[in-house]
């Protein structure tokens, strides 16, 4: 049973094996069954943008192959008209050369659901546009619910039991030096569309889960506005005084040296305070402090 095997891989965190299995399942009936449970969206690739392509409420995602969204290359931009059940896909050039698109992106009257609002706001700013009207951030919602699975959409869908139609990026783009957009553009476009459709499907279940956990207000009133502030900090940067930092650095180095000397005096010998193994011997063998936890490699010196 492939579904049971995938769940086993997830539980055991066999991520490499899971991604390999997903790569083999690109065209399987299991994938098709999941897709059948979600609304069917028409996919349209745009060479030009007109007003009818820009809905009042949308789900938007910008694709990059690099993790660093400040310097990465945009390989595609996709958004959904939820009401009309259409996914539009276009290039960076078409989107950011369109005044209509940039005006829509900056409009607070046009709601946008995102995967990562901070990332989208920074990407837009680096291309001379504002990103406003953010109504939902999928990653922030997921992080509040389950911090360990706030990564790819493939992981997020399991939290609220949404049908999974999205493959891991690695299964589509490859990894390392061979990471690239597929030569078959239909595969690439479908991957982007699947991300968008999944984000549409995730919004309400994630909101319901946040409400159950009494974190919806935290999400809406604190976390979402904070993401915008953090994005603006990344965009504008933070002015620092180099001389002041250097003075403080010297003070910190001296303070750390004094603390290390004091530790050695209390221990009665010199040792590497940054070595958990050496620190464990001093604390639990020489000073006879109570042992809270012991691992295969020695005493645990963790805070807990």
What is the predicted function of each stretch?
Residues 1-92, 181-188, 192-304:
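Conserved "right-hand" nucleotidyltransferase catalytic core of DNA-directed polymerases
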Residues 35, 72-212, 222-226, 230:
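Active-site-proximal helix-loop-helix substrate-binding element of RNase H-like nuclease domains
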């Amino acid at each position: 049973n492939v579904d049971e095997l995938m769940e086993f891989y997830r539980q055991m965190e066999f991520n490499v094996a899971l991604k390999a299995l997903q790569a083999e399942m690109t065209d399987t009936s299991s994938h098709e069954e999941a897709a059948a449970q979600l609304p069917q969206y028409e996919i349209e690739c745009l060479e030009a943008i007109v007003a009818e392509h820009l809905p009042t409420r949308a789900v938007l995602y910008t694709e990059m192959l690099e993790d660093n969204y400040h310097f990465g290359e945009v390989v595609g931009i996709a958004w959904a008209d939820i009401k009309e059940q259409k996914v539009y896909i276009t290039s960076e050039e078409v989107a950011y050369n369109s005044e209509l698109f940039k005006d829509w992106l900056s409009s607070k009257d046009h709601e946008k659901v995102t995967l990562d609002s901070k990332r989208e706001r920074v990407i837009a700013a680096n291309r001379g546009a504002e990103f406003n009207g953010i109504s939902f951030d999928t990653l922030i919602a997921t992080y509040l619910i389950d911090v360990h699975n706030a990564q790819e959409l493939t992981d997020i869908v399991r939290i609220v039991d949404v049908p999974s139609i999205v493959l891991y990026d690695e299964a589509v783009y490859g990894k390392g030096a061979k990471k690239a957009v597929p030569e078959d553009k239909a595969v690439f476009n479908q991957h982007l569309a699947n991300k968008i459709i999944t984000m549409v499907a995730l919004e309400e279940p994630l909101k319901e889960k946040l409400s159950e956990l009494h974190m919806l207000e935290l999400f809406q009133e604190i976390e979402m506005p904070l993401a915008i502030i953090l994005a603006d900090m990344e965009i504008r940067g933070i002015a620092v005084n180099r001389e002041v930092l250097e003075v403080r650095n010297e003070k910190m180095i001296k303070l750390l040296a004094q603390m290390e000397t004091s530790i050695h005096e209390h221990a009665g010998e010199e040792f590497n305070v940054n070595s958990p193994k050496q620190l464990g011997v001093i604390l639990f063998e020489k000073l006879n402090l109570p042992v809270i936890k012991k691992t295969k490699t020695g005493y645990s010196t963790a805070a807990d």
